[in-house]
């Protein structure tokens, strides 16, 4: 029998068929509102359940608001819970009706049952109606003094809710001071934890416009408070323990004894069953001992066992999180984990994401003593049914080979992969063989003899085909059929969709031409003609360049395209050391899982106010080389600032440099003179103009004859700065937008300082020793940007500084904004003096 049509189907009994059913509910609730008959509470429960059910599936039942409130006059806690849930959901959208709930909620806040008092207080604070905040102050004050810890816990959270609704009401009622007192004296651990969480959030938000809040926030990091929490840490639940440990990370110990005392207090937390607590403890240990090399290494030894235990005992998801943190530690100290490499062997039932991470860790811990065992294990994975893991295992073998561990055996293993006759194995192996030949040219005979037997028709992946073409061009003299294979590939130019492959074809044809000209001349002509007509800009430009350089001089073209082979000693890492250090600073966060700093995967508006300068995300600066742009304006054009808004950037666009000349776009005529200008430079040789400012670049460090004298030191500073100055990032951002630019200046940075920039946090620590504090930093070579702030010792006067250092020119662009314009020049002198000493012994 066919089902009835949609229009003839009966409505589900769990869903209202229309407004009539909601009206029926309203009528039934009104009838039960004043009834005291036996079983009335059961009837109310059934009706409440229907209302809540409709509400959860998105049906508007706000019309029964009044009836729900009238039926709440009962001692049944289940009814009250459902009523509170309903009221909290509809109160914000019905502020007028919310007034009806105030009386019964305030009455319930005084109930004899602490559970009802707590539930009522939580519901009262969840109304989120600004007009009703005056009714929250009294119940919250009573709740904070309640004898029952559950009510106090709810009241503390309610204070934070009140602050978000009306900050002034919360501050005027002196609730933060009450929370601080509770935090330091309450006997219940959950109340203390809630107080800490609420105060951190309130004071962080208040610090942007209140110096008192800044001081209060700093007081959380005082030694008595930190030790108070650490001594009681066993009383707290896992969430609260993580909160306390995160606070302890920011504490600056006074001496080494302080460090050892904290580690002794937290020693047993490393054995905790909760992985979050263990990772938070590990972060404390690592951060405390960063300046103590020997102890830091011992910490690695100590934390190794707990982390490996968590990896083997948890779910795949937990194992992955722990492994991600272990991977970070393994990369920083591989020798400590070298003996434990078997812990990173893949299990057959593990998810692919766990296996992939373990393969990376096996690559990191490989050394002379364990390479054979690790490579043997990796070769087994190459036959894995999971193609992604098979590819990763082959790449891992290649990475180990590039580390110069047991190269002979590894090359033999890689060449054996080519005999497996699996497309993806062959493709990955060809890419690795190419890299091996770049580093170990002496293996060319063995590799080429095997690679020469591979048909290019069987290679479909662009990277693998590009690697094969590179070998055909680089070793054309050793491969008898190289010109003919290249000719066949060039004839199918139109069928090749990868620009990378077409670029390699052009270069390989050129190289083969210089080694076997008669056999390659026709193919080269075809390739150049096809390349010049190619729609891809890079392919077109390279073909045109090759054509013109061949027209100019064949011998010059050979020196340019096919110079003598030089072995590559080191391959570029995928991540800079600065990125890795930033991820390490964000240990026990998503940054470790994603293997990138938080500023790379969070939106600007969601980053929030960071509490300390070393936690403010990097400021991305695009290092575009434009010789026509004066330095100060170049950085403005490339700025992707985290701290400055659009208005501030627009304001600065018209600011001229210290010579008084604003940026002007280069004319088209200037580009036509580039060649002649380069010729003039080539003829003039090393001679320099007497008026040209001396450049202190990296060449000075390598003894190339340039002067290494430091920049002249400015006159001694006359301004005294506050060594303990504090300024919240939010306040810095607000001031930076409001204050005008007081001074813009350029100064030189000595070569030692340029070299010292490679050490993470080096400039930040140096300037801090001169009472100038960093609030944000970032960039990538050659441009690095820093934002500093300082305060006068005698009065709260702020100096905000933007400093952009270009390592190529060894120049620093300084922009200062000050509360007191009269002392701006004096501060600039102090700043330049400190900067001139950077990197000096």
Swiss-Prot record:
Subcellular location per the Swiss-Prot or TrEMBL entry: Golgi apparatus; Golgi apparatus, trans-Golgi network; Cytoplasmic vesicle, Clathrin-coated vesicle membrane
Region spans: Disordered: 1-25, 650-671
GO cellular component terms given for this protein: clathrin adaptor complex; clathrin-coated vesicle membrane; Golgi apparatus
Keyword Transport assigned: yes
Composition skew (Polar residues), residue ranges: 9-25, 654-671
Main localization (coarse): Golgi
Biological process per Gene Ontology, one example term: intracellular protein transport
Subunit field text: Adaptor protein complexes are heterotetramers composed of two large adaptins (beta-type subunit and alpha-type or delta-type or epsilon-type or gamma-type subunit), a medium adaptin (mu-type subunit) and a small adaptin (sigma-type subunit). Interacts with AHK2.
Family: Belongs to the adaptor complexes large subunit family.
Protein name per the record: Beta-adaptin-like protein A
